[in-house]
Swiss-Prot record:
Keywords: Antiviral defense, Cytoplasm, Endonuclease, Hydrolase, Nuclease, Plasmid, RNA-binding
Family: Belongs to the CRISPR-associated protein Cas6/Cse3/CasE family.
Misc. remarks from the entry: There are 3 CRISPR RNA loci in this organism and a single cas gene locus. A CRISPR-Cas type I-B system.
One Pfam family here: Cas_Cas6_C
Deleted gene: phenotype: Loss of the 8 Cas genes in this locus (cas1, cas2, cas3, cas4, cas5, cas6, cas7 and cas8b) leads to loss of CRISPR interference against plasmid targeted by this CRISPR locus, i.e. plasmid is not destroyed by CRISPR. Upon disruption of only this gene, no visible phenotype when grown under differing temperature and salt regimes. Does not produce mature length crRNA. Can be complemented by endogenous Cas6, but not by Cas6 from halophilic archaea H.lacusprofundi, or non-halophilic archaea M.maripaludis or M.mazei. Loss of CRISPR interference against plasmid targeted by this CRISPR locus, i.e.
GO molecular function: endonuclease activity; RNA binding
Lineage: Archaea, Methanobacteriati, Methanobacteriota, Stenosarchaea group, Halobacteria
Active site: residue positions: H41 (proton donor)
Protein name: CRISPR-associated endoribonuclease Cas6
UniProt KW Nuclease keyword: yes
Length: 272
């Protein structure tokens, strides 16, 4: 599930490429008065949402129409935000200032068993490998040992695709355990992969981004953007893919990373 805000710019502005922290703060303004969500604001697992960038990308002129999406597997969270944005129409991300003209809800679905399609990351995937995962794949942890990478190692192409896919699966499993449907096995409890095909969107695969996880804290993180092809095997797999659409993939999703869009879908042919 997700909501889309239709935004009208109230002033000219340069596009803020380091919008992550400010956008997260604007979303939290809509949740802070609800104890269900405010009590987990600073928890390790968060409350379960991801969000897009403000799009289309580029210089903003007064009167421009832009859009912003927020996704979550928690219907109550989105209902709370809809009510808030309906009352508080100002939407300001630093110098990017908008008013909310319209709010719409969407429930993208990858389709029944046999459906094929493509998911694309609208924002970069944050994938930092902890020591345990790095050691499982026999990766060089010398930078971690030397304190150069704190306690994590950012994924790079030289590490191979398996650690990336494993990290994505583990983070989605955590979301399943916190906010998913316990009728289904989680993505970490099945042997089959989430995706049939994985293609990088950017030629260089990974790219650095300045990131402010908290006020007065500046970091540079490595991100990657992906195009994921899929064929739905069964209802459990359908649930896993839709959960990824609702929650995003990778780490720090509540900071604006790993937001997914369904860009192509083909339903199975009806049998003769």
């Amino acid at each position: 599930m997700r909501i889309e805000l239709a935004l009208d710019a109230v002033a000219d502005a340069a596009y803020d490429r380091s919008y992550f922290h400010k956008a997260r703060g604007r979303i939290w303004r809509g949740l802070e008065n609800d104890d269900t969500f405010s009590e987990t604001h600073d928890s390790n697992h968060g409350v379960g949402f991801s969000y897009s960038n403000i799009f289309p990308w580029g210089q903003i002129e007064e009167g421009d129409r832009r859009y912003f999406r927020i996704a979550s597997p928690r219907r109550g969270l989105l209902d709370t935000l809809i009510a808030h944005f309906g009352r508080e129409r100002a939407f300001e991300i630093g110098q990017m200032r908008f008013t909310i003209d319209d709010i719409t809800g969407h429930a993208p679905d990858v389709g029944e068993a046999g459906s094929t399609g493509v998911l694309e990351t609208g924002t970069g995937v944050h994938c930092a490998l902890g020591r345990q995962l790095a050691e499982e794949y026999n990766l060089d942890t010398s930078k971690i040992d030397a304190g150069e990478s704190e306690t994590e190692l950012f994924w790079r192409p030289k590490h191979g695709m398996e650690p990336l896919q494993d990290a994505i699966r583990r983070s989605l499993q955590q979301t399943h355990e916190l906010y998913g449907d316990d009728y289904y096995d989680g993505p970490g409890e099945v042997d089959e992969p989430l995706f049939d095909r994985i293609e990088p969107i950017k030629d260089d695969v990974v790219y650095p981004v300045r990131f402010q996880p908290a006020t007065a804290v500046d970091r540079t993180v490595l991100l990657s953007k992906w195009r994921f092809g899929y064929r739905v095997r069964d209802e459990t797999h359908r649930y896993h893919l839709n959960l990824a659409l609702d929650s995003g993939i990778g780490q720090r999703r509540e900071h604006g990373f790993g937001f997914l869009n369904l860009t192509d879908k083909t339903l199975p042919r009806a049998s003769d």
